[in-house]
Amino acid sequence: MYSQSMVLLAAAFASFVAASPMALHGANSCSTGPVHCCNSVEHHTQPHANSLARGSGLVGLDIETLVGNIGLDCSPIGLSSTDCTAQTVCCDDVTFDGKVAVGCTPVNLSVL
């Protein structure tokens, strides 16, 4: 019984790790694309996330339709650079010329 529980736990952990959008394809890329440096990363449910998006010039963006973390004012990190004075993230989608990144997960480049 104990060994079955351990096998189930290990399988669940492995599927969680495989589904995480962590950096997997080299020092500055994620499974979803390049690592980005975002000046601000907020969860979409934070009260000020909508005002941050509007302050970035994204008046037409409906924050309520987004899920997860939202990165604002993002730029991809170059192949040989790990310089980011803000938050490094892997994101599902980057739109509005880098103004908004959705589905973002923070990453630590020092451990990649």
From Swiss-Prot:
It is found in: Secreted; Secreted, Cell wall. InterPro entries: Hydrophobin. One of its GO terms (molecular function) is structural constituent of cell wall. Keywords: Cell wall, Disulfide bond, Glycoprotein, Secreted, Signal. Pfam families: Hydrophobin (PF01185). One of its GO terms (cellular component) is fungal-type cell wall. Disulfide bonds join C30-C90, C37-C84, C38-C74, C91-C104. Residues 1-19 form the signal peptide. Glycans are attached at N108. Self-assembles to form functional amyloid fibrils called rodlets. Self-assembly into fibrillar rodlets occurs spontaneously at hydrophobic:hydrophilic interfaces and the rodlets further associate laterally to form amphipathic monolayers. Aerial growth, conidiation, and dispersal of filamentous fungi in the environment rely upon a capability of their secreting small amphipathic proteins called hydrophobins (HPBs) with low sequence identity. Class I can self-assemble into an outermost layer of rodlet bundles on aerial cell surfaces, conferring cellular hydrophobicity that supports fungal growth, development and dispersal; whereas Class II form highly ordered films at water-air interfaces through intermolecular interactions but contribute nothing to the rodlet structure. Belongs to the fungal hydrophobin family. This is Class I hydrophobin 17.
